[in-house]
Amino acid sequence: MAQYIKQGKSESELKDSHGKVEQTVASLIARIEKEGETAVRELSRQFDNWDPEQFRLSAEEIEKIVRSVPDQVKADICFAQEQIRHFAEQQRASIQDIEVETRPGVFLGHKNIPVNSVGCYIPGGRYPMVASSHMSILTAKVAGVKRVIGCTPPINGEIPAATVTAMHFAGADEIYILGGVQAMTAMAVGTETIEAVDMLVGPGNAFVAEAKRQLFGRVGIDLFAGPTEVLIIADDTADGEMVATDLLGQAEHGPTSPAALITTSKKLAEETVAEIERQLQTLPTADVAKVAWEEHGMIILVDDLAEAVVEADKLAYEHVQVLTENPNYFLDHMTNYGALFLGPETNVAYGDKVIGTNHTLPTKKAAKYTGGLWVGKFLKNCTYQRCTPEASAEIGRIAERLCELEGFIGHKAQASLRVKRYGK
């Protein structure tokens, strides 16, 4: 039976803090809907101390910013984008349009049609999330989206040059230096200077994530995103240093980022706790990671790998790193996760930044019903049908009876007209 050696905050405690975020975001959205560009500008000034003549960067400004970025940084961005583009292109190639003749004269099909416009949010705040440019903008472009715009906030009153460079290289059609709820709402509802989009994607802080949730419906979204999560599944072949390093490597994202260990080894669990305490003494981001670990960290001791799968599927975490003798066991048996990282040779940082899979992944148990962002999220699977006259009459006779069975007389009339015109 699973034994909790360490537990984080309860769901009820987390919900209490979320209620305040929900109310704040709702009021900001309502204000922007009412006041438009004026509210966007005032909120940008209030939250980011940012009030430029135009939020949108001109082609000349982008060119100047790109030139200011060191060549090595640009080369690394290009390398990462090559990996992400290649995998996204392979995923796109796996999605096929079809047309089949299901019975004589009845032709059914579907087409995968890209969304016309997408707004991508590239977070800033504590860290410039350069990689989010690749994951959202580039992936949308590979999917065939015609208009892809990107918003990213200023950082300490400055334009994040590396982020803008990545957005530009990824293929953004419009780049705005604008952050927070004001950016999400402006993209969703439109303003005097920003044309509304059909879909919002990308991660962000609690306020950005809540804005996306509240705006869902008038626009599509990729998924509901919460604080990043990491789960490590390990047996006695793993070592405490690697487990602790990989847990803290994600805990540094923010003070509410859950980091969990499921292990069959009590010895490893104890080593990991000690190693985390040791690493927190020197980790530059310990001020954040320590809070995340103390308030949201978790260690679960299980009897065997089968029980580890059960517990891992209950958590349904965003990132699941497997440090066991046979990592593929979890590839074969787990069903609820955002992304799997199999073996000590890979890790979550690779997926977050460069290896090629998308880092926008489900959190807060959403992995129970959805995967992460990929080219398929930007495609609408739309069906169509057509019939020969003979098939129309045949289908119509059955449709007449089924419509009458349900009491839909107007529906029956549609079928009856075809039977009359095309039947023999």
UniProtKB/Swiss-Prot annotation:
Which GO-annotated molecular functions does the record name?
histidinol dehydrogenase activity; metal ion binding; NAD binding
Chain positions recorded as Zn(2+) binding sites? Q250, H253, D352, H411
- For the keyword Disulfide bond, the answer is no
- Cofactor detail note: Binds 1 zinc ion per subunit.
- Cross-referenced InterPro entries, in alphabetical order? Ald_DH/histidinol_DH, Histidinol_DH_CS, Histidinol_DH_monofunct, Hstdl_DH
Q: Give the CC-aspect GO terms.
A: cytosol
* Record key words, sorted: Metal-binding, Oxidoreductase, Zinc
Report the EC code(s) recorded for this entry.
1.1.-.-
Gene3D superfamilies reported in the protein's UniProt record:
1.20.5.1300, Nitrogenase molybdenum iron protein domain
Q: Which residues form the active site?
A: E318, H319
Q: Name one GO biological process term.
A: L-histidine biosynthetic process
UniProt superkingdom: Bacteria
Q: Which PROSITE patterns match?
A: HISOL_DEHYDROGENASE
Q: Does the keyword rRNA processing apply?
A: no
What this protein needs as a cofactor is:
Zn(2+)
Q: Which Pfam families match?
A: Histidinol_dh (PF00815)
Q: Which family does it belong to?
A: Belongs to the histidinol dehydrogenase family.
Q: Which NCBIfam families match?
A: hisD
The name on file for this protein is Histidinol dehydrogenase homolog
Which species is listed as the source? Shouchella clausii (strain KSM-K16) (Alkalihalobacillus clausii)
